[in-house]
Amino acid sequence: MLAVRSLQHLTTVIFITAYGLVLAWYIVFGASPLHRCIYAVRPAGAHNDTALVWMKINQTLLFLGPPTAPPGGAWTPHARVCYANIIEGRAVSLPAIPGAMSRRVMNVHEAVNCLEALWDTQMRLVVVGWFLYLAFVALHQRRCMFGVVSPAHSMVAPATYLLNYAGRIVSSVFLQYPYTKITRLLCELSVQRQTLVQLFEADPVTFLYHRPAIGVIVGCELLLRFVALGLIVGTALISRGACAITHPLFLTITTWCFVSIIALTELYFILRRGSAPKNAEPAAPRGRSKGWSGVCGRCCSIILSGIAVRLCYIAVVAGVVLVALRYEQEIQRRLFDL
């Protein structure tokens, strides 16, 4: 129940998703041929002991590549794109004496597809961070509904569990008799949890010492959150090496903007949550609506919200699959061919 239970976590998920989509768009469609590859070159008239220089394609220079594949084996599909932009060395006759023309001729000794490095490092970190943050959200929401939460006003009533309402409707409509076992179980769980929360707020150290499993669960939840955020922030801090000369300025600006927004959003929610008064008395329970309208309204709202969220998940997954199938050849052509 991501969209219903935690709007603050949904905000972060949306920003991470947008960051990944923008990065994927640049890798597949946005990168021009000048921003794809870098070449380790040496001037044609230079000695063999001259250091290699990494540079991107330059239309004012003539790049001469090796006529055959490297000794270690055939070129990878990613590297083949880079070698397709240069001329084979045996197809050009150089002057015997190095001159102005020879200084504009570069012998290519190695080529690297920077989009491959961008896909294997930055994009992979974003995807892993996205999944880890979703795992944190799922674990946190289950703990708010069934586990120990402090402050107490952060707890979610277990009676709102979707399976409880679904079981009651199925038993009433199809079996023609009320089914209340899940409801009684959730009520007992709510009473026990309120007692545990009071013990935890009174003495957290002793509470966690006698119940280490709860501490392990909370620790795993925090670990998932900070590792996910660390991976997202790491996408802006990792060194791109020689490939930095091929990335345009807007890619760097976009990366830092998304990383800053995600980090500041999480920091804001953490500080706002920590400033909430822990000794605040719980609000008085609202009066329950009488009649069929109140029962049906509350029941249907929770069920329909759960169904709507799950339909949104299915629609997103189906959309990604359909787009991948529709543009599969285009994506492969962008990544592997000219």
Curated annotation (Swiss-Prot):
Spans traversing the lipid bilayer: 122-140, 213-233, 244-264, 302-322
Region (Involved in fusion), start-end ranges: 31-121
Keyword Transmembrane recorded: yes
Cytoplasmic side: 141-212, 265-301
PTM info: N-glycosylated.
UniProt key word Transmembrane helix: yes
Glycosylation positions in this chain: 48, 58
One Pfam short name: Fusion_gly_K
Residue runs in coiled coils: none
Signal peptide limits: 1-30
Membrane-topology annotation of the record: Multi-pass membrane protein
Keywords, in A-Z order: Glycoprotein, Host cell membrane, Host endosome, Host Golgi apparatus, Host membrane, Membrane, Signal, Syncytium formation induced by viral infection, Transmembrane, Transmembrane helix, Viral primary envelope fusion with host outer nuclear membrane, Viral release from host cell
Segments for region (Interaction with UL20): 265-301
Family: Belongs to the alphaherpesvirinae glycoprotein K family.
Subunit structure: Interacts (via UL20 interaction region) with protein UL20 (via N-terminus); this interaction probably plays a role in the coordinate transport of protein UL20 and gK to the trans-Golgi network (TGN), and is required for the cell surface expression of gK.
Listed name of the protein: Envelope glycoprotein K
Native species: Human herpesvirus 2 (strain HG52)
